[in-house]
C-alpha cells in the first residue's frame, strides 16, 4: 500500500473535489517519486536481493536502510544468520572473537534483506504530502515563483517553491550509493 494516497492528500489539504478526478492521485504519486529520488530509495518496506563485491572493508553498502537480513551468501556459500549487524544501509558481520569480518576485494556477496520502513516515518509522509499539496495548488501555474505586491509600499515579495526546500527536512534518512 502506498504511504501517500489520494484520500490522505485530500484530508491533508482539506480539498475534496466534487467531480471524480485522478489528479490528486497523480500529485500523490509524483510527490512519492520526488521523495524516493531524493532519498535514493523507496521509503516503504520491501524485500531486496542484491549482489555485491567485497572491497576490502568491514561493511557492505546496501541500496536502502536495513530492517532485517533474510540471507547472505559469500562466494555462493550460505552464511549463518547470527552475527550480522546493520546501521542505516551498512551491513557488517561480527565474528565469534568480536572482530568485524573484512570482505576482501573480489569476494561475491549475495544479500537478501528487508529495507525501508513500516510505518514510513511521519516526517517523510508529511514531506510527501506537502509536495503533493504544492503540486495541486500550482496546477496550471508556475511553482517556481509567486509574488505579492503591496500597493502602499511598492514592495514585492517573492516566494520560491523549489522541492529541495521541503526535501531538506528528511535529509537524515537520505543515503548515498556506491
Predicted regions and their residues:
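Divalent metal-cofactor coordination and adjacent catalytic microenvironments
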Residues: 1-178
Amino acid at each position: 500500500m502506498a504511504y501517500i494516497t489520494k484520500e490522505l492528500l485530500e484530508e491533508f489539504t482539506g480539498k475534496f473535489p466534487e467531480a471524480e478526478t485522478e489528479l490528486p492521485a497523480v500529485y500523490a504519486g509524483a510527490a512519492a517519486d520526488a521523495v524516493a529520488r531524493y532519498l535514493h530509495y523507496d521509503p516503504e518496506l520491501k524485500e531486496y536481493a542484491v549482489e555485491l563485491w567485497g572491497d576490502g572493508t568491514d561493511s557492505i553498502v546496501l541500496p536502502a536502510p536495513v530492517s532485517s537480513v533474510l540471507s547472505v551468501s559469500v562466494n555462493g556459500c550460505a552464511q549463518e544468520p547470527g552475527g550480522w549487524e546493520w546501521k542505516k544501509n551498512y551491513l557488517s558481520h561480527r565474528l565469534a572473537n568480536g572482530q568485524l569480518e573484512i570482505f576482501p576485494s573480489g569476494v561475491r556477496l549475495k544479500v537478501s534483506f528487508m529495507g525501508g520502513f513500516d510505518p514510513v516515518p511521519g516526517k517523510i509522509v508529511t514531506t510527501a504530502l506537502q509536495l503533493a499539496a504544492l503540486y495541486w495548488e500550482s496546477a496550471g501555474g508556475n511553482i517556481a515563483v509567486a509574488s505579492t505586491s503591496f500597493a502602499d509600499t511598492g514592495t514585492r515579495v517573492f516566494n520560491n517553491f523549489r522541492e529541495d526546500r521541503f526535501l531538506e527536512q528528511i535529509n537524515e534518512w537520505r543515503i548515498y550509493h556506491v
